[in-house]
Amino acid sequence: MRVTVLGAGDAFSSGGRRQSGYLVETQGKGLLLDCGTTTLLALKALGIPAERIDLIAISHLHGDHFGGLSFLFLEYIYEHPRTKPLLIAGPPGTEERVRALHSAMYRELAARGVPFPVSFYEFAPEQKETLDGVEFFPFRVPHQEKDISLGYRVRTDGKAILYSGDCGWNEGLITHSQGTDLFICECCYFSTQTNFHVSYPQIAEQRHRLGCKRLILSHIGREVLERMTEVAIECAYDGLVIDL
């Protein structure tokens, strides 16, 4: 399994980092975890064909996590015409929001539809599901007041990955990290404490309780970048490749 970090930054692209996107590749299968607005840019900068993506799993419906979908659609329509199916999964409301996004950005194009099969699947939190050969356990995390945000424990090709999405610190991260090969955890803040994002001191304090073989911090915010000399946990960067 290979995981490529397409974007390790926050919504503000702090430090010039791209927005969230992680390509998980196994034997003949490509899973994209989140699709921030810079995802297509990242793929092209890294020389990765967009057609490698078979399945997209969105953690929550904020622009820096799903706003790049319209640009992928354009790529698949004009630059590298796609014929194979594309499955887009996410929390409740995903299909409606993706269609609204595409219509807002390219109304006439959206009205014509795309010339390849697109299907949607909306996860029910805490219910295991297998999509296109990939096993998901989606769990709700604290990030939005009303809309559902998800973290994912993903298992495929004999490996397990935990992806926090955006969230405040919660016990689910401890529970679902047990026995995983990789945990990609958001770390937006250093000194700021909120219920909606993880701060570095929080995860440093809880590190010993995590059951992952490898922990990588991502969604790095300005506060963390300004104090990187104090960070003792591995941090993601745009273009990082992780072989498991």
Residue ranges and their predicted role:
Residues 91, 165, 218:
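Glycine- and other small-residue-rich loops at beta-strand/loop junctions that grip anionic moieties
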Residues 1-162, 228-244:
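Binuclear metal-dependent hydrolase catalytic cores
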Residues 37-38, 142-145, 167-170, 221-223:
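Short beta->alpha connector loops
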Residues 168-244:
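Cap/insert and terminal regions of metallo-dependent hydrolase folds
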